[in-house]
Swiss-Prot record:
Coiled coil: none annotated. It comes from Clostridium botulinum (strain Eklund 17B / Type B). GO terms for biological process: glutaminyl-tRNAGln biosynthesis via transamidation; regulation of translational fidelity; translation. Belongs to the GatC family. It is an enzyme of class 6 (ligase). This is Aspartyl/glutamyl-tRNA(Asn/Gln) amidotransferase subunit C. Its EC number is 6.3.5.-.
Amino acid sequence: MSVTKKDVEYVAELARLSFNEDEKESLASDLNQILNYVEKLQELDTEKEDIIVNPYYIENKFREDEITPSIKLEEVLENAPKTLEEYVLVPTIIREQ
């Protein structure tokens, strides 16, 4: 499988990105190099290798999930530029085509 300029254009459109022609060619080339590397990795024979999820034993250092006091909804709404009932209104970013 190889990535074409048309593939880059399609994904860019989905992500709402724009690239010039040189960037499209460069991205297609970079993505093809990545795919070639992944293909090489898939050729490796790992049947005799031990499964290692994590080579180091790392203990979870995160705190426990506990409910803590937070800012009140009224305070949030007072600081928002626009609100509707208990929602903060934000500018539209994505519109239907």
